[in-house]
Amino acid sequence: MGKNKRKRSHTKHVFVQKKYRDALFRRIFNEKSVLMELYNALNQTDYDDADELIFYTIDDVIYLGYKNDVSFIVRGTLNLYEHQSTLNPNMPIRGLIYFGKQYESYIKQNNLNIYGKKLLSLPFPQFVIFYNGVEPLED
């Protein structure tokens, strides 16, 4: 008289809201010394003057919904670091938009004349995406 008992899975899933994960990433790397360590690890450099970092993170209040995680200039490179917990094949497009906004801000802050006859020197762009989602990511 044995009834088939279905085994129940007692696996619990903890979901953290995306905005909190983004906020954590931003909070951790908002400290210049920690960000410099990450930059050095990614670029195989050994810079130690965190004051060389100039933050250029887009604020969504200014740019109507556009927000990036961490962006900064160091030694002639405009770095954009994005944290993603879900796959998004449109990250290159978003990166292009973010860089456009950042260059616009850089040009204004440095009073550069994009209509002049002199070729402007702008920071070189570097885009890094940190992905820690559960879906497999193809190379």
What are these regions (language model features)?
Residues G2-D139:
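Accessory alpha/beta interaction modules
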